[in-house]
Amino acid sequence: MDNYVGKRLDGRYEIQEIVGVGGMSVVYKAYDNVDDRIVAVKILKDEFLTNDDFVRRFKNESKAIALLSHPNIVKVYDVSFGEKLQYIVMEYVDGITLKEYNQKQGAITWNDALFFKPKY
């Protein structure tokens, strides 16, 4: 796995730490020195850069997220689809994943599930 911690992307995004690893990408916490904010940068793994199917999926993911607008969905701020590096810059949300929550608290109860449901 490529590690971008300590590197700067496009002279703007200072990669600070890994926050998640998936099958085709790695998500990093980064500092955006242009907009002065913390962001999440999702980078397509190098091994998939030459696979047209994975590149297409990655691009489609960024388009789908960018089209959605809801308080519970992160915003897409920027994308880069270069030949050697492809990434999506998104709103960073600090906290734990549902998987981590379940590991710490056990199975989620009905009361907890109702707490997390949208309140319309």
Description of each model-found segment:
Residues 1-15:
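A short, low-complexity linker immediately N-terminal to eukaryotic Hanks-type protein kinase catalytic domains
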Residues 79:
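Activation-segment/catalytic-loop signature of the eukaryotic protein kinase fold
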Residues 83-97, 101:
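Conserved short submotifs of the Hanks-type protein kinase catalytic core
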Residues 15-22, 27:
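Protein kinase glycine-rich loop
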Residues 31-38:
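Conserved N-lobe loop of protein kinases adjacent to the ATP-binding glycine-rich P-loop
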Residues 20, 60, 69-72, 85, ...:
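Flexible N-lobe loop architecture of eukaryotic-like protein kinase catalytic domains
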Residues 116-117:
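Activation segment signature within eukaryotic-like protein kinase domains
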Residues 45-67:
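AlphaC helix of the eukaryotic protein kinase fold
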